[in-house]
């Protein structure tokens, strides 16, 4: 795909469930305390986490996302580390052996992970390359928070990159139905927060 087509696809995904993603981002940053080292995964929901970051607090942020790096560039009170790697076709992010090797040099207090899909069996994405980076991010962080809007629950993607016992918390929105909530509580056994979203047009 051409760069313009790739950008369109990313921004089109970002518009989906935008109110939920913004609300999730605002909730997610309440988990951050001053002086933390935070990894922010690539994705449209994690982009909203980056946008909601406080302007001060002596944070260090690592990311593989060009969109997130662009959002945070020049932000006061924040040290930004852009992980190197190969630019992916179809989305503005970096992956590959260089990205994974760079991640092994860092230890973070917290990682915000995005996903294309989650269900009773775990956390999934469409890309083996992105999965490899996400695994390294989780391995290099003391705490892992999955940020995903409710439309991702029950979706079908073929690359599993994390089991539920690797996730400390899920932040999603109140669009989950009763069965999905029971699945998360009783099968996945994951603490989860559902933010309220105003869906009135």
Regions from the PLM with identified roles:
Residues 58-59, 170:
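Conserved helix-loop-beta element of the AMP-binding
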Residues 18-22, 47-56, 83-90, 131-136:
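Short charge-dense sequence patches
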Residues 1-42, 50-58, 66, 73-77:
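HTH-adjacent hinge/linker in prokaryotic transcriptional regulators
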Residues 66-201:
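Conserved phosphate- and dinucleotide-binding cores of soluble alpha/beta proteins
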């Amino acid at each position: 795909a051409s760069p313009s087509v790739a950008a369109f696809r990313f921004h089109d995904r970002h518009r989906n469930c935008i109110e939920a993603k913004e609300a999730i981002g605002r909730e997610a940053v309440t988990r951050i305390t001053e002086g933390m080292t935070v990894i922010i995964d690539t994705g449209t929901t994690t982009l909203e986490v980056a946008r909601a970051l406080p302007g001060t607090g002596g944070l260090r942020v690592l990311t593989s996302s060009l969109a997130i790096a662009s959002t945070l560039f020049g932000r006061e009170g924040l040290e930004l580390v852009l992980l190197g790697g190969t630019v992916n076709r179809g989305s503005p992010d970096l992956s590959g052996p260089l990205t994974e090797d760079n991640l092994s040099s860092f230890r973070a207090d917290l990682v915000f992970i995005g996903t294309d899909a989650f269900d009773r069996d775990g956390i999934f994405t469409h890309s083996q390359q992105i999965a490899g980076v996400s695994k390294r991010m989780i391995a290099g962080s003391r705490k892992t928070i999955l940020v995903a809007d409710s439309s991702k629950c029950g979706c079908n993607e073929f690359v599993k990159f994390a089991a539920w016992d690797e996730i400390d918390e899920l932040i999603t929105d109140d669009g989950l139905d009763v069965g999905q909530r029971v699945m998360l509580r009783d099968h996945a056994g994951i603490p989860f927060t559902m933010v309220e979203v105003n869906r009135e047009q």
